[in-house]
Structure formats: C-alpha cells, structure tokens
Amino acid sequence: MATNNLSILFVASEVEGLIKSGGLADVAKALPEALQNLQQDVRITIPAYTSIERLADAEVVLETNLTSWPHTKYRVLLLTLGNNPVYLIDCDPYFNRPSMYAENNQAYTDNGERFAFFSAACLDMLPKLAFQPDIIHANDWHTGLVPFLLKHRYGNDPFFAHTKSVISIHNAVFKGVFSYDDVQCLPEFHCRNVPDAAVSATHITMLKAGVMNADKINAVSPTYAEELKTELGSHGMAWEFQQRAGDLVGILNGCDYSAWNPETDIYLPMNYSADKQSMVLGKNTCKRALQQRLNLAEKDVAMFGMVCRLTQQKGVHYLLPALADFLKHDVQVVVVGTGDPVLAAQLEEVAAQFSDKFVFVEAYDNELAHLVEAGSDFFLMPSEFEPCGLNQIYSMAYGTLPIVRGVGGLKDSVNDYDVDPCDATGFVFYEPTSQALLLTMLRALLLYAQNLTEVQRVQLHAMQKDFCWRKAAESYLQLYRSALN
C-alpha cells in the first residue's frame, strides 16, 4: 500500500463521456480525473451497456465466470477516458438493453439482480486483473453492495487485507429496495436475516448495505451530510446515518469549468470574462440572443432563468403559484426542462397567459441551457432538497446570481445578499413556500431596478468564486487516508 500515492477503484453506474443520465455521471468523470491529476492511480468501473458508443473500441482484458448466478460468464473490457482507465463489466443478459435502468418509465424488474451482479463482479475481477486498490469508492445504491461484499465475502481474503471502502451519497431518495428473492444469487442473503442491509423481513436496501458496511461515507455537501441524519433529509434512513455519524463527512462537488466557462463557451454569441466591461457587454449580448431565441421583446429588463428536471424536488411547485404575482412586474422569465407532465401543463398555462413575459421550453437542450445561464440576470433553484446542485455554481461562473432555497449544497455554496452584501453571490430563502420564493425574487428584482451597478458588482464577485474539482479531490484524498488509518 502506497503512503502518498493511492490506488483507487471508482465504481459507478454511469460516467460522463461514455454514458450519462444524471449528475452522478459528471462526478464519476471529473473526480477520478482530478485525483489522477494529483498523481493517484484511479480506475473507473461501470457496466458495459450496449448503448455506449465506444464499446466497439474496447479491449477485452478478462473473460471469466462468477459462480452462483443464472448468467455466470462475464468479460472485462478496457477503455480510457482522459487519463483514466475504465473497466466495463460485460454480461449481455444484464446490460444488453436499450436503456440503463428503465424502459417506458418502468424500471427493469431485475435491477436488483443486475446491480448485485455488477457489484460482485467488480470485486471478483480485481485479483484476476492483479489490481489491488487501497480504496474502493462506491456511489449510490447501484454499488451499495460493494462495501457489503468487501466486508462479508472478502473480509478474510489476504488480497483485500488492506483495501478499504468509501461510499458517496448523491441522492438518498433512491435506495435500491429489493426483495430477498431479487438478490438470491448472493449466498450472503440466503439466510434472509441480514440486519445491516434489511429494510424489512422481506426486503433489503442496497444503499443501507453500503452505508452500514463502508469504512467511510460521504455526502456531496456538508449541509447534506447533516440533513442525512434527520428523517426529512434521509427519507427514512436517519437511524443508519446517525449510527455512522463519526464516519460521515460532507464534501461539496466541484465544477467542470472546461464545460462551463463564459470565456470559452462555444454556445454563446459572445464570450466574456470577470472584467466589468467584458461581463456587461457579454451578458447583454447573450441576453439579446436569448430574447431572440424565445421570441421575447429585446429590452433591458431583469431576466430570470431556470433549467431543471420538472419534479417536486426542484421546487417547480413553489414557483408556479408565485408566477402570477411576479409576472405583474416588468420582468422576463424562462423555464427549460422536461419531466412531470402535470407540472409541464401548468407551466404551459402560465406561458399562454403571460406570453410576452414568460416562456416555457419543454426540452433538454444543452445549448439553450448555456444561453440561459449567460443571458439571465438571476437563476432560480427553489429546491425542496438539493444534495449538492451544480447549476448554482455554473450560474456564479457566468455572473448570473442564483436564487436558492437554503438546503444541501445550495446553502453551502451561495452567500445571501441580505446577510453579507460584500461577500454576496446570490439570494437565499429557507421557508418551503411559494411566498418565501416570491419575496426573494422580489428582493432581487428591487435591487436590479434600484441599483444595477450594485447587481453588477455582486455578479463580478460571484464570477471570481472557485469551486474547482482539485479542491474537492484534495478533500477526498483526506477522506481516503482517514479510511486507511
């Protein structure tokens, strides 16, 4: 085991650059990359989904068997992503499907077996590949059985004698709850009495298995780590997180500034920097382009943007009742996103009623998302809960002031103007109501109307904040070393 440079296996269900459905994929690419830049040996493992375009280029490095499964044969394929090797666990019956997790909004009925197999194969392959990691870093429920199996199956295996496990909690809402029948391929569950994984007499939760067996646990922001110890924040796992409180830390995710940088962003009509003249000209140009794209009047009014999944978590249900009052003012608002059809229909109604001020774009449009970040003056994130959040960090990089609810990573990353104007980077409210959101939007609008110069000062200050992945990676290294000690 190296004292300074560690060998790390980063296990996830998806990784940006190969396959992505959400923010976990961004972390799975950026964190290993940042750790590699700190001279660590980091290798990523994901399933070999057939929808990965680069799969045909992969090298076969192992063909082997995993006993006691209906489908025992699997291969390990090798690709590189940047400077990181990526091992792909290839087993057609489990991963040769049109999607990763679900089809037609219906989760695959054998997801428990699929990701139990993946977790078991991740550990099974290591001695066969002669890769002996110091740390195995699991992520969310999909890989929750990795720390469990490391302890229960390989606890006395000399190959793993010095290997420790860490699990990251990106969103505790999703726990991976399955019946014992779903995971009967694992002998460890044959007795149907596994307290450190059980959620009832008949079901286990893979996330609990990870939390109760990992050497260290991290949440993706310090505030979220505290929230996980409450019933509301943990969505039913408060006891488990309280039991492991001494091993639970919060590390705020970093930002991939190579993809989100107004100085180099290829989607903007004009790039700009954190220089006042450059920022004012650049943001005004982007606002005009955004207004043209949305068929809104090209005028100097405050622009409020929101890009999100249309779910209750993102606080769209707080925004909707606030819009009728807010849109009486001289403002423009754009919401971009897909998701809940009921929320989408309600947003369409507002757009029909206030067509000169409010636009709803029901789409996932990356180019438009970049333009909204640059062309807006304020960015709305009234989340019900937000483990980390990234859009508030992107917004600050683009000189767009986030309006956030003070939960999770939003609380950790945004400084409220009313609390400390000098160090402000946005506006924060706490009460989970439409009225609290409305009052905060009006606070921002009033400052814009009365003192645009002050708004621009705060925007420039926000642009100078640094949430780079290197800082986060250094914190993860400390966490890994504490696990090893």
Swiss-Prot record:
GO CC terms in record: cytosol
Enzyme class: transferase
Binding site for ADP-alpha-D-glucose: K20
SUPFAM superfamilies: UDP-Glycosyltransferase/glycogen phosphorylase
Pathway terms, separated by semicolons: Glycan biosynthesis; glycogen biosynthesis
UniProt keywords, alphabetically: Glycogen biosynthesis, Glycosyltransferase, Transferase
GO MF terms held by the record: alpha-1,4-glucan glucosyltransferase (ADP-glucose donor) activity; alpha-1,4-glucan glucosyltransferase (UDP-glucose donor) activity
A Pfam family the protein falls into: Glyco_transf_5
Record-listed E.C. numbers: 2.4.1.21
Source taxon at top rank: Bacteria
BP GO annotations: glycogen biosynthetic process
InterPro entries: Glyco_trans_1, GS/SS, Starch_synth_cat_dom
Catalytic reactions on record: [(1->4)-alpha-D-glucosyl](n) + ADP-alpha-D-glucose = [(1->4)-alpha-D-glucosyl](n+1) + ADP + H(+)
NCBIfam families reported in the protein's UniProt record: glgA (TIGR02095), PRK00654.2-2 (NF001903), PRK00654.2-5 (NF001906)
Function: Synthesizes alpha-1,4-glucan chains using ADP-glucose.
Family: Belongs to the glycosyltransferase 1 family. Bacterial/plant glycogen synthase subfamily.
Protein name: Glycogen synthase
Organism for this UniProt entry: Vibrio parahaemolyticus serotype O3:K6 (strain RIMD 2210633)
